Amino acid sequence: MDSFVEGFKLMIPAVAILIFAWSLKGMGDALGIGVFVENLVGTNASASVILPAVMFMIAIFLAFSTGTSWGTFAILVPIVVAMFPGQNNLEMMIISVAAVLAGAVCGDHISPISDTTVMSSAGAQSNHINHVSTQMQYAMVVAAVCIVGYLIAGIVKIWWAALGSSLLILFAVLTVLKRREQKKDAEEQHA
């Protein structure tokens, strides 16, 4: 019986997040947020171009602040789906939902209050803040490339073209970083 009570206690935050997400979606529907954003984006071509990148950054911020990717999914995915009613902008809806999912996972990954980050540092028996600061450096490089990729996706509206160009950009960035590090190591050896 004790395990039942303990298990229920562990589920309370997840249930609360879902209830708040449903409430937020209900308020958004009542206020017509989806229609407002659709009209704003529909009349402004530049807004639709940057929408996936903006949603990616919002998801990173929200997941970093709350320490949960699933809560961010529950809050932002219904909002993004409501922005694209019908079949007329299906490609942009898919790209924007992907941006939310990726941003939420990135924000959760670098958040010092995320359960996965806490468990990773505890499992590795390392200082928690050192663990957060070391993984943030790598994640921010990839996040910057993702922002460029989502801008490309907003322009071309073809997911595989954006993915391919993002991979090429990431390869170029990593190559430049590697060469810079090799040059720095060579200078230190000669000094």
Regions found by a protein language model. Give the residues of each.
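Membrane-embedded alpha-helical segments of transport systems
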Residues: 102-111, 135-149
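Hydrophobic alpha-helical transmembrane segments of multi-pass integral membrane proteins
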Residues: 18-21, 45-93, 100-108
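Transmembrane helix-loop junctions in multi-pass membrane proteins
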Residues: 25-37, 65-67, 146-160
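Short amphipathic alpha-helical coupling elements at transmembrane boundaries
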Residues: 2-10, 35-43, 118-122, 129-133
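Core transmembrane alpha-helical segments of multi-pass membrane transporters/permeases
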Residues: 1-35, 49-61, 65
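Membrane-interface alpha-helices at helix entry/exit sites of multi-pass transporters
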Residues: 89-91, 124-139
